A protein has these predicted regions:
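Histidine-centered divalent-metal-coordination microenvironment in nucleic-acid enzymes
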Residues: 75-78, 103, 109-137, 162-172
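Conserved short beta-strand edge segments in small beta-sheet-based binding/regulatory domains
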Residues: 42-47, 147-159
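Catalytic micro-motifs at enzyme active sites that drive phosphoryl/nucleotidyl and oxygen chemistry
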Residues: 60-68, 99-115, 152-157
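Residue microenvironments linked to proteolytic maturation
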Residues: 154, 158, 164, 174
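Helical (often loop-to-helix) elements that flank the catalytic cores of nucleotide-handling enzymes
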Residues: 86-105, 126-153, 173-193
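DNA replication initiation on ssDNA origins
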Residues: 1-75, 80-89, 163, 169-178, ...
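Alpha-helical context
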Residues: 54-58, 122, 143
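Residue-level "edge-of-site" marker
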Residues: 2-4, 116, 159
Length: 193
């Protein structure tokens, strides 16, 4: 598991790091520690090749969380922004209403919805990890469906194999605030594809 941190140090300046964990509990502990220090914590949506973890353990600290090192995925994830100037919904209720409309109009299962502090992340959790090629195909097709249905999503997030997203139970410290990252709706559970 890869945990990514982003510490805001001033106007448009930040320090980023990545941490590798061998278990969910170890990853959670890293995230809790970062959050207690008012540092934004994210998790990588991909599982990475074994060699990546071995390099990290040997002290290689360069950015190993890159798309070419990603191999398996357990979620299809999408980002809906709120309150930004463009490609965004004005308010959270409007974003959630539009998401519900698109899901219902297309007979999709309701996704897990996470309030990120500045929008929502939606996740279709998979019952078992899938390989990158299958993930890219599924994520891309669902992205096209969302866009064609009029849902305003960040088009890059959904097929970015090196993407990191905020961790539920931590906080969004962007812009000097402390907004909880929380589950808004649990959705219809995990899915098989």
């Amino acid at each position: 598991y890869c945990i990514f941190s982003l510490q805001h140090t001033g106007e448009k300046k930040s320090i980023s790091n990545q941490y590798w964990a061998s278990s969910i509990s170890e990853a959670a502990k890293i995230a809790e520690d970062l959050d207690s220090k008012r540092i934004d914590a994210y998790y990588a949506i991909a599982d990475y090749k074994k060699e990546v973890y071995e390099k990290y353990k040997k002290g290689e600290r360069k950015n190993l969380r890159i798309a070419e090192n990603a191999c398996r995925f357990s979620t299809l994830s999408y980002d809906i922004d709120v309150g930004k100037v463009k490609n965004s919904y004005a308010e959270l209720p409007e974003a959630l209403k539009e998401l519900r409309r698109v899901v219902e109009d297309n007979d999709l299962p309701m996704p897990l919805i996470v309030g990120s502090g500045s929008g929502v992340h939606i996740h279709y959790c998979l019952e078992a990890p899938i390989e990158k090629e299958q993930w890219l195909s599924l994520a891309g097709r669902l992205k096209v469906l969302f866009i064609n249905a009029g849902l305003v999503i960040d088009p890059v997030v959904s097929t970015d194999a090196s993407r990191v997203l905020r961790i539920v139970g931590t906080h969004n410290y962007k812009k000097g605030g402390k907004v909880p990252v929380r589950i808004i709706a649990e959705g219809d559970g995990s899915h098989t594809y």
